[in-house]
UniProtKB/Swiss-Prot annotation:
Comment on protein domains: Has 3 domains, the large (RuvB-L) and small ATPase (RuvB-S) domains and the C-terminal head (RuvB-H) domain. The head domain binds DNA, while the ATPase domains jointly bind ATP, ADP or are empty depending on the state of the subunit in the translocation cycle. During a single DNA translocation step the structure of each domain remains the same, but their relative positions change.
Lineage of origin: Bacteria, Bacillati, Cyanobacteriota, Cyanophyceae, Synechococcales
Annotated region (Head domain (RuvB-H)), positions in chain: 283-375
Protein name, UniProt field: Holliday junction branch migration complex subunit RuvB
Designated gene of the protein: ruvB
Function: The RuvA-RuvB-RuvC complex processes Holliday junction (HJ) DNA during genetic recombination and DNA repair, while the RuvA-RuvB complex plays an important role in the rescue of blocked DNA replication forks via replication fork reversal (RFR). RuvA specifically binds to HJ cruciform DNA, conferring on it an open structure. The RuvB hexamer acts as an ATP-dependent pump, pulling dsDNA into and through the RuvAB complex. RuvB forms 2 homohexamers on either side of HJ DNA bound by 1 or 2 RuvA tetramers; 4 subunits per hexamer contact DNA at a time.
InterPro entries: AAA+_ATPase, AAA_lid_4, DNA_helicase_Holl-junc_RuvB, P-loop_NTPase, RuvB-like_N, RuvB_C, WH-like_DNA-bd_sf, WH_DNA-bd_sf
Length: 375
């Protein structure tokens, strides 16, 4: 299976893309953010990616569904149905697209939606696909409208409708395409338009990983990187990885660096814990910014409730960054609650930071939290 990436546009495209700002200002120095770090995007990850469905760890329901789809497509000698993968970043959507291509014995063409801002960008990709090839579009919710409309007939009828000319002299010739499989990946499925979403025959969600599955992933990566690691060391890294394989592999690399300099030999649980404390990743996977947000909420606002804008101003972050970068994991592990009157730190968050939770009598009742308007 060959992997072809279209993430390196021509100079004109690079200049155009440089003008596009990301929707959220995200910290780039944190080890526990699920977004790919720049060096992870640039460095080939083929050596640690699983190549076959049987080697893909975790996501058992997804593997069962896709295993059936692959077997059925092979038996009919057809291409796979179009697939939409959604879920938080770092859970293996790109890896799954590559696995599908390997299982089907075809090429995988990789691109991102922001790179397809002009019609010729997507047309060039589609006309060069061979029968059965996989076209993977990351961040598909960010497709420009004109590009999305070109995809409609391509996905349904394997046909390109190109308008040439304007006004009464305009004509729309059709170009027949080879059958292909479009795999779209998104972290915001609600941002997709209904016409695009409805054209996917398979829509599957990737879920956060359990510690056991992450431990297996860490051990597998360590073997591929020739890094001696015991069970306790793998578990220590896994439990601080926020349920995300990308973070687990990133933490393993940092622990490997620490061990090479400070503690040569197999990485034990104690070594992994010491290394990750050095990098400000605590046993629950919280980093300094997560703890600062909770500390502000507890120390300055008595644990809440407090409105999003107020909390963002107190922490020096913009509201969108707080809502989309910091809060999801805090909500996932039960350290933060979103209520109509605002954000509330849970008793578990108080105890994790070493504070004594206030007595229930001093708290707003659940009914009050559900009915009071947010300030």
């Amino acid at each position: 299976m060959a992997i072809v990436s279209s993430k390196s546009p021509d100079p004109a495209e690079r200049r155009s893309q440089a003008k596009t700002k990301p929707s959220v200002s995200e910290p780039q120095d944190s080890l526990v953010r699920p977004q790919a770090a720049p060096e992870e995007s640039q460095r080939p990850e083929d050596q640690i990616r699983p190549q076959r469905l049987a080697d893909y760890i975790g996501q058992p329901e997804l593997k069962d569904v896709l295993g059936i789809a692959i077997a059925a497509a092979k038996s009919r000698q057809e291409s796979l149905d179009h697939l939409l993968l959604y879920g938080p970043p770092g859970l293996g959507k790109t890896t799954m697209a590559l696995v599908l291509a390997t299982e089907m014995g075809v090429q995988c063409r990789i691109t991102t939606a922001p790179a397809l801002e002009r019609p010729r960008d997507i047309v060039g990709l589609l006309v060069n696909l061979q029968p059965g090839d996989v076209l993977f579009i990351d961040e598909i919710h960010r497709l420009p409208k004109v590009t999305e409309e070109i995809l409609y007939p391509a996905m349904e009828d394997f046909r390109l409708d190109i308008t040439i000319g304007k006004g009464q002299s305009a004509r729309t010739p059709s170009i027949t395409l080879h059958p292909f499989t479009l795999v779209g990946a998104t972290t915001q499925i609600g941002a997709l338009t209904s016409p695009l979403r409805d054209r996917f025959g398979l829509v599957q969600r990737l879920r956060f990983y359990e510690v056991e599955a992450l431990t297996d992933i860490v051990q597998r990566t360590a073997r591929l990187l020739n890094t001696p690691l015991d069970q306790a060391g793998a578990e220590e890294i896994a439990k601080r990885s926020r349920g995300t394989p990308r973070i687990a592999n990133r933490l393993l690399r940092r622990v490997r660096d620490y061990a090479a300099v400070k503690a040569p030999g197999p990485i034990t649980g104690a070594i992994a814990a010491t290394a990750l404390e050095l990098y400000n990743v605590d046993p629950c996977g919280l980093d300094w910014t997560d703890r600062r947000l909770l500390s502000h909420l507890i120390e300055n606002f008595g644990g809440g409730p407090v409105g999003l804008e107020t909390l963002a101003a107190a922490t020096g972050e913009d509201a969108q960054t707080v809502e989309e970068v910091y809060e999801p994991y805090l909500l996932q592990i039960g350290y933060l609650q979103r209520t109509p009157p605002g954000r509330v730190a849970t008793p578990a968050a108080w105890r994790h930071l070493g504070y004594e939770p206030p007595q229930a009598s001093g708290q707003l009742t659940l009914q009050q939290l559900l009915t009071e308007p947010e300030t």
